[in-house]
């Protein structure tokens, strides 16, 4: 619920500007109005106009999430003249934040075998840190990476606990 609220507040801060169906010029729209120190809006720009401003060698999987959203958003902009990039990115961020919390809790509870209270407190502590909480609302790749890292810790931890080797799947 908190992740939904934060993303809603971010979108509402410049709603009419962020959802303009501009034909090009998304760099100016987003960089002029999105100000979050240390975080960029390149995901919105990529979904809006397929201009890639991040290093794809370091984030190859991330582009595979964004490209289908670009195609859908491009069609929607042509059809209704409205940019849905901020909503598409918010769905990815909320989904990733929720599962990052879930996998982190499960690592504490099932892999490390902590009590429910301790696992809950440590999960809440982790997500109370600013550089963990802020990525759950900004259009950046950090929370997606946290979800995959916590998922990897959970899967590898459960395999280690059972004494099994990791397989291709």
What annotation goes with each model-predicted range?
Residues 136-143:
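Short acidic/glycine- and proline-prone juxtamembrane loop motifs at membrane-interface regions
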Residues 76-99:
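Loop-to-helix entry region of an early transmembrane alpha helix in multi-pass inner-membrane enzymes
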Residues 1-50:
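Transmembrane signal-anchor helices characteristic of membrane glycosylation enzymes that use polyprenol
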Residues 104-128:
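Transmembrane-helix signature of polytopic, membrane-embedded enzymes
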Residues 49-83:
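Short hydrophobic/aromatic helix or loop-helix immediately within or flanking a transmembrane segment
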Residues 144-161:
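Specific aromatic-rich, kink-prone transmembrane helix
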Residues 10-14, 70, 74, 105-113, ...:
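Membrane-water interface at transmembrane helix exits
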Residues 160-169:
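Short hydrophobic alpha-helices at membrane interfaces in multi-pass membrane enzymes
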């Amino acid at each position: 619920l908190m992740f939904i609220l934060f993303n809603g507040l971010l979108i509402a801060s410049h709603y009419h500007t962020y959802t303009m169906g501009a034909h090009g010029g998304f760099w100016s729209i987003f960089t002029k109005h999105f100000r979050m120190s240390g975080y960029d809006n390149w995901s919105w720009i990529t979904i809006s106009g397929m201009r890639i401003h991040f290093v794809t060698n370091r984030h190859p999987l991330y582009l595979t999430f964004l490209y289908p959203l670009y195609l859908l958003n491009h069609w929607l902009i042509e059809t209704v003249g409205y940019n849905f990039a901020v909503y598409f990115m918010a769905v990815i961020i909320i989904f990733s934040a929720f599962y990052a919390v879930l996998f982190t809790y499960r690592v504490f509870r099932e892999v490390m075998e902590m009590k429910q209270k301790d696992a809950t407190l440590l999960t809440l502590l982790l997500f109370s840190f600013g550089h963990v909480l802020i990525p759950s609302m900004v259009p950046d790749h950090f929370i997606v990476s946290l979800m995959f890292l916590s998922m990897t810790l959970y899967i590898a931890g459960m395999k280690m606990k059972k004494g099994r080797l990791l397989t291709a799947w």
